[in-house]
Amino acid sequence: MSRSESLFAQAQKHIPGGVNSPVRAFKSVGGTPLFFKHAEGAYVVDEDDKRYVDYVGSWGPMILGHGHPQVLDAVRNQLQHGLSYGAPTAMETEMADLVCSLVPSMEMVRMVSSGTEATMSAIRLARGYTGRDAIIKFEGCYHGHSDSLLVKAGSGLLTQGVPSSAGVPADFAKHTLTLPFNDIAAVEKTLAEVGQTVACIIVEPVAGNMNCVPPAPGFLEGLREQCDKHGVVLIFDEVMTGFRVSLGGAQGYYGITPDLSTFGKIVGGGMPVGCFGGKREIMGCIAPLGPVYQAGTLSGNPLAMAAGLTTLKLISRPGFHDELSDFTSRMLDGLQQRADAAGVPFVTTQAGAMFGLYFSGADDIVTFDDVMASDAERFKRFFHLMLDGGVYLAPSAFEAGFTSIAHGDKELQITLDAAERAFAALK
């Protein structure tokens, strides 16, 4: 029995399912989840001392690679001064100033402790600002586990009140309308019918929770136009894309300005952090300035601010994101070439330093249906073959992958060699 198998059995005694977040359980790919004990640069090391090139990156935050020396030094320095004060600090102001300078749409920002808190708070703020109850989200887009966002799409143009988790009251979920991602016509039709009741549209500008689906040409522009037309707040959920697809996030990458944005992952440099912000007029509704309440004991805690500030400063150097995007492109091109040579139907998607892998014969992946039509069973086999080859991919066919600045030519060769063997075995 491996050390991971032993630890997983032990974990299940007191942790539901043996994990503290469901995707970690490997249910989508089968087998025993790996337990890691160390991470450095582009690598993670499991409890049996096997090293893997890591394309999960703690689900996105580790854009500098694991254990960057300057980030660790910043955290160690803060440790000498205490863990948390529950009071304002100079670093919070410095962080707010930096975030607002990097993301032009952010005129004011509020720190929280997770991406879920950020999206939950942004939606409450949009409702308070507009005085409306309904929200629109899209198929396959995940915005955290707050009740109003755990709603899935059904068939037809518009689905109301279909909770995708037990414990979400139907009366609460009925205010969430779910539309097809990349379908601006559905948005136009819905807003024409019920636009006066809609507080906000929340969208992942790149859908990173059905692997990696970039916006179709005109989709984000259409959302901006329709929100302006109907007085609806446009929220970009950049928890995943923020500071990754470009320094200014997806909104900078695609040139679209939302009213509110949510961030997480990279903004904390590996610590539990989220933030939300946007137009000063809207943010002025948040307590203590306005009537929309939001609070948090550990919001803006100094350890997280130290890690996040250092990370954002390091990734702000000229050329950083170009290097990341170039590596990601070379890796995906290499995978595609090897899949084609093996005769395996395969397609990739990319937005900066995030990517998607699909076992599909489609020319492109644009919709939720395209994603669901891909061969998840073949991905399972590919995942384990790559794992055997020393490459750790996201353990789900529906999660995006991430690269870091620590990935280089050596890691690229390991990845492509493992993929060549894997594709040959998948014939």
Swiss-Prot record:
EC number(s) given by UniProt: 5.4.3.8
One Gene Ontology biological process: protoporphyrinogen IX biosynthetic process
A GO CC term attached to the entry: cytoplasm
InterPro entries linked to this entry: 4pyrrol_synth_GluAld_NH2Trfase, Aminotrans_3, Aminotrans_3_PPA_site, PyrdxlP-dep_Trfase, PyrdxlP-dep_Trfase_major, PyrdxlP-dep_Trfase_small
Required co-factors: pyridoxal 5'-phosphate
Record's keyword terms, sorted: Cytoplasm, Isomerase, Porphyrin biosynthesis, Pyridoxal phosphate
Classification via NCBIfam families: hemL, PRK00062.1
Annotated catalysed reactions: (S)-4-amino-5-oxopentanoate = 5-aminolevulinate
UniProt xrefs under Pfam families: Aminotran_3
Modification sites for N6-(pyridoxal phosphate)lysine: K265
HAMAP family with a match to the protein in the record: HemL_aminotrans_3
Molecular-function annotations in GO: glutamate-1-semialdehyde 2,1-aminomutase activity; pyridoxal phosphate binding; transaminase activity
Major location (coarse): cytoplasm
Assembly information from the UniProt record: Homodimer.
Subcellular location: Cytoplasm
Superkingdom, natural source: Bacteria
SUPFAM superfamilies in UniProt: PLP-dependent transferases
PANTHER family: GLUTAMATE-1-SEMIALDEHYDE 2,1-AMINOMUTASE, GLUTAMATE-1-SEMIALDEHYDE 2,1-AMINOMUTASE 1, CHLOROPLASTIC-RELATED
Associated pathway: Porphyrin-containing compound metabolism; protoporphyrin-IX biosynthesis; 5-aminolevulinate from L-glutamyl-tRNA(Glu): step 2/2
CDD domains: OAT_like (cd00610)
Top-level enzyme category: isomerase
Protein name in UniProt: Glutamate-1-semialdehyde 2,1-aminomutase
Entry's family note: Belongs to the class-III pyridoxal-phosphate-dependent aminotransferase family. HemL subfamily.
Species assigned in the record: Pseudomonas putida (strain W619)
